UniProtKB/Swiss-Prot annotation:
Cystine connections: none
Protein name: Tyrosine--tRNA ligase 1
Top-level enzyme category: ligase
Subcellular location(s) of the protein: Cytoplasm
SUPFAM superfamilies assigned to the protein according to its UniProt record, in alphabetical order: Alpha-L RNA-binding motif, Nucleotidylyl transferase
Keywords: Aminoacyl-tRNA synthetase, ATP-binding, Cytoplasm, Ligase, Nucleotide-binding, Protein biosynthesis, RNA-binding
Motif segment ('HIGH' region): 39-48
SMART domains (UniProt xref): S4
Organism: Streptococcus thermophilus (strain ATCC BAA-250 / LMG 18311)
GO cellular component: cytosol
Catalytic reactions of this protein: tRNA(Tyr) + L-tyrosine + ATP = L-tyrosyl-tRNA(Tyr) + AMP + diphosphate + H(+)
Span(s) of short sequence motif 'KMSKS' region: 229-233
Lineage summary: Bacteria, Bacillati, Bacillota, Bacilli, Lactobacillales
Enzyme Commission (EC) number: 6.1.1.1
Length: 418
């Protein structure tokens, strides 16, 4: 199976320019290709992972990746299928984000070894020195307004309004392709399916300005089986930065993927062979309640993004929480697992009984409710039920002398720190 056939089999090809010419280019030898990442935040997220891992697959097949971080285009903002104008960021902010994103990309692509080692580029290196007049003369003249207006990403914004800044974005991305072709011989661009208009602006510029052919592959924007945009948890992006989305949170995200999506996501997000995935799928279908596909998916992706140790910690936390065995976890583990849970700080020598504690920490709304909660068995300290109204916290309730977890009911957790 060729690399192009494998990408198709994994569901990683949404659209291409001339497929026959593209297949021939892959057959004739190593292809230099690039994928662009605009710094719109200080971290990439799961939505970016499809293109990143596709780049890695191509590198493993012998092709040469260029990872372009948009230090210049990030200052402008891509309008593609956005309902409103992006907020412009300062140059200093974008520079900081560029640096962080470059660090993240180095986890997935090999920048050190072999003739096809990856190369990191920043489009500010060429846009930073070009004058407005030169850009209009040397690039702008190759694009008609009619051509630019025909892009679906622009059409969707015409009625609500689009600034010239964002309107010109497609020319900037097109010039990236031209520049990388001229400097490094890059002939293929890979990106999300929402980028088709911007990417083909690059092939158009190559054709008209340099009389050369370029290729484009778009990867699909991933949705779950209900059509919901993939990569968000509770409405928030699942980030690749462990300080923004912990490995435990990422593990839980994959573990909770719907049954109908799990095997498909194994093809897209893991490096297991298609034969292995087929076998996992068969076993999974025989006992879906055991969630084998989700467990394998969580293992493979968390290990890939954060490493084996982080994966093992996530599994350990999950198992102990499920068993209600909170005292088997360290304070560090609990802080990871309960990230975002309401926290109440008390003095280490504060001797509040359970009723006062529940009210002061706003766990129960009143002393009357607090008494009822305790008497009804709704209060748990570190996973153990407390029904004594005179119960007072002791040192044995302080995990690592740092933290106590109080649960009200089945799901409402609260953290006490000292």
């Amino acid at each position: 199976m060729t690399i192009f056939e494998e990408l198709k089999a994994r569901g990683l090809i949404f659209q291409t320019t001339d497929e026959e010419a593209l297949v021939k280019a892959f057959e004739e030898g190593p292809v230099s290709f690039y994928t662009g990442y605009d710094p719109t935040a200080d971290s990439l997220h799961l939505g970016h992972l499809v293109a990143i891992l596709t780049s890695r697959r191509l590198q493993l097949a012998g092709h040469k990746p260029y990872a372009l971080v948009g230090g210049a285009t990030g200052l402008i903002g891509d309008p593609s299928f956005k309902d409103a104008e992006r907020s412009l960021q300062t140059k200093e902010t974008v520079e900081g984000w560029v640096e962080k994103i470059q660090g993240q990309l180095s986890r997935f692509l090999d920048f050190e070894n072999g003739d096809n080692k990856a190369v990191m580029v920043n489009n500010y290196d060429w846009f930073g020195s070009v004058s407005f007049i030169d850009f209009l003369r040397d690039v702008g003249k190759y694009f008609t307004v009619n051509y630019m207006m025909s892009k679906e990403s622009v059409k969707k914004r015409i009625e609500t309004g689009i600034s010239y800044t964002e309107f010109a974005y497609q020319i900037m991305q097109g010039y990236d392709f031209y520049e990388l072709n001229a400097k490094y011989g890059v002939t293929l661009q890979i990106g999300g399916s929402d980028q088709w208009g911007n990417m083909t602006a690059g092939t158009e510029l190559l054709r008209r300005k340099a009389d050369k052919s370029g290729h484009v592959i778009t990867v699909p924007l991933i949705t779950d089986s209900t059509g919901k945009k993939f990569g968000k948890s509770e409405g928030n992006a699942v980030w690749l930065d462990a300080t923004k989305t912990t490995p435990y949170e990422m593990y839980q995200f994959w573990l909770n993927v719907m049954d109908d999506d799990a095997v498909r996501f194994l093809k897209i997000f893991t490096f297991l062979s298609l034969e292995e995935i087929e076998e996992i799928g068969k076993e999974f279908d025989q006992a879906r309640h055991q969630r084998l596909a989700q467990k394998v998916l969580a293992r493979e992706v968390v290990t890939l993004v954060h490493g084996k140790e982080a994966y093992e910690q996530a599994v350990h936390i999950t198992e102990q929480l499920f068993a209600g065995n909170l005292k088997a976890l360290s304070a560090r583990d609990l802080k990871v697992a309960l990230n975002g849970v309401p926290t109440y700080e008390i003095s280490a020598d504060e001797n509040l009984n359970i009723v006062e504690l529940l009210v002061n920490a706003k766990i129960s709304p009143s002393k009357r409710q607090a008494r009822e909660d305790v008497q009804n068995g709704a209060i748990y300290i570190n996973g153990e039920r407390v029904q004594d109204l005179d119960y007072t916290l002791s040192d044995t309730d302080k995990i690592d002398n740092e933290i106590t977890v109080i649960r009200r009911g089945k799901k409402k957790n609260f953290v006490l720190t000292y």
